[in-house]
Regions:
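A short, polar/charged loop/turn motif at coil->beta-strand junctions and beta-hairpin connectors
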Residues: 106-110, 156, 185-187, 226
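Metzincin-family zinc-dependent endopeptidase catalytic domain
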Residues: 127-215, 219
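Short, solvent-exposed loop/turn elements at domain surfaces
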Residues: 89-91, 95, 121-126, 169-173, ...
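Buried hydrophobic packing residues in well-ordered domains
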Residues: 114, 140, 214-217, 232, ...
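Soluble non-cytosolic domains of exported or imported proteins
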Residues: 68, 84, 123-135, 202-211, ...
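Pocket-edge structural micro-motifs
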Residues: 116-118, 164, 194-195, 234
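Disordered inhibitory propeptide/activation segment of secreted metzincin zinc metalloprotease zymogens
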Residues: 5-125
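Metalloprotease/metallohydrolase-associated module, dominated by Zn2+-dependent proteases
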Residues: 2-45, 178-207, 223-268
């Protein structure tokens, strides 16, 4: 192992001890991923499942600039991770993404264009679900990250498309798919949200909003955390973003996308 990777391994281990990098272990447990409605008087009683260990993603080979992987860049990123990682679950995000950071590019003030399917001919679906999804984007947009969202009527012009499904055949209630280039810059994304739990119960207002917040978190590049007070925990029991959700998203967008360690087999 090269000295650079050895130093980072020690650093990441220390960081993991604080922010809970059990994501490797979580991969084996993620079949138990359930997102439930917010705790409290208005809590949902319908479990919202999201069994996939990470958002589905695909790579567009040859897109974008080549990854930045020189020693100086990696040392800088790792130093910033070590100094700023306290109070975040960035270590778990790295573990889930094969030690890489995936995020949307800096857009110079241009918002991400969001299209939400306006009509769904599905039993029990109502238009009241649409503002719940909008609210999820707005809440993340106010989380201190350099992302703005606008809502468009034409799906062809959208960067992100949100659609509805009656229920999934697999035990999930929401799914996020995004594509990234060779540098781990996210290029486009889609979210699918279920109207019914896989057992047939209607996903109520609290459950729909919770899964929307959770999936938009995946959309911007986050993954699961063992912090049960955060919206990105596998079993969501909160109504809003936690300080750790906000801090992790902010740190993610302070750093460049791409691997934070040398890839095995790279000729350096």
């Amino acid at each position: 192992m090269k000295r650079l990777d050895l130093v980072f391994a020690i650093t990441l281990t220390s960081l993991a001890g604080f922010v809970g990098v059990e994501a490797y272990a979580m991969r084996g447990q993620v079949g138990e991923r359930h997102v439930v409605g917010s705790a409290g008087a208005n809590a949902s009683t319908i479990p919202v499942e999201d069994e996939s260990p990470r958002p589905n993603r695909r790579v567009r080979k040859g897109s974008g600039a080549p990854p930045v992987n020189n020693d100086r860049s990696l040392v800088d990123v790792r130093t910033r991770l070590e100094l700023s990682g306290v109070g975040t679950y960035i270590g778990e995000v790295l573990a889930a993404h094969d030690s890489a950071l995936a995020r949307w590019p800096d857009r110079a003030g241009q918002p991400l264009r969001i299209w939400i399917q306006p009509i769904a001919r599905l039993r029990d679906w109502t238009p009241t679900a649409i503002p719940l999804v909008r609210d999820a984007f707005i809440e993340w947009g106010e989380a201190g990250v350099p992302l703005n969202f606008s809502f468009v009527l034409d799906s062809a012009s959208a960067d992100v498309r949100v659609t509805w499904i009656d229920r999934f055949s697999e035990p999930i209630s929401g799914k996020t798919l995004w594509s990234h280039d060779d540098r781990w810059t996210i290029l486009e994304a889609n979210i699918v949200l279920a109207v019914h739990h896989r057992t047939g119960e209607v996903l109520d207002t609290a459950a729909t909003r919770a899964i929307a917040l959770h999936e938009v978190g995946h959309l911007i590049g986050l993954d699961h955390t063992t912090d049960t007070t955060s919206i990105m925990t596998p079993r969501v029991r909160v109504k809003t973003l936690s300080p750790a959700d906000r801090a992790t998203a902010q740190l993610l967008y302070m750093l460049p996308p791409g691997p934070v360690r040398e890839r095995q087999g790279e000729d350096r």
